[in-house]
């Protein structure tokens, strides 16, 4: 999966919340609470963090 393949609104949401300082686990949990499968949530967040130049830990 590539960051660009994510829905535009999801990419925007991820960027916005990373800029606000939310960490990996908080973002993953939010996506899971919204109904996204665990693997997809982790991959999407990791891609967004990598794009933002943030650590994945």
Where are these regions (language model features)?
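Eukaryotic low-complexity, mixed-charge intrinsically disordered interaction/regulatory segments enriched
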Residues: 1-57
